[in-house]
Amino acid sequence: MEYSKEDLMEAKRQILGVGENMGTEESKKIWEKNAQFWDDAMGDESNEFHREVVRPKVTELLSPDPSDYILDIACGNGNYSSYLAQRGASVVAFDYSKKMIELAKRRRSQYAKQIEFCVADATNRESLLGLKRNRAFTKAVSNMAIMDITDIEPLFMAVYELLEENGIFVFATQHPCFITLTEKYMTPHSYYDIAIEGQPEEQIYYHRSIQDIFNLCFRAGFVIDGFVWTGS
């Protein structure tokens, strides 16, 4: 019997992780190892997928302008932070990988007056509230990251507190319908996989249904007033 590459990858996911609750510290260690590769792969302007698929729709929903003070969640090497800075916004950008933040600061040094890069843990409410500054954030954004975060409830709750009244939170994520086995769709689970071919370590993905994600939004106090789906 012959198996396609997709069949083998799905079997690998099931063997390595489905149903396990792999934690934040393990994920953090993986991203420390992947940081240099990720910075090299994303470069100054991000990769084609982010530039052509993710960024246009996120920017359409976020509608950034020079008056904005924006929280960039799980910022990686800061490619979207610098994109916002180019449009005049001020940004606080964080990631839980110290190595990634070091690389972001180095790569985006020309935006030092507009972007403040920080290390913070998106699963820890106190760590997140430590990002509070004298001015409330007008907007918050997360590009293709919440599926990499062990527990997003503390994040959603803290972001609501950090935003000004009627502030905007935009996040992009994989569509959960198309990245897991149908019978597993309603069951939160985690698995190992890669995002970019050649990365040193497989990262951990945390599957949640759209229902799970939206209910967390509602519990935090958000009202969903925009939703965009796009094929990759």
Label the model's feature ranges.
Residues Y3-D65, N79, Y83, L103, I168-E197, ...:
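Conserved class I S-adenosyl-L-methionine
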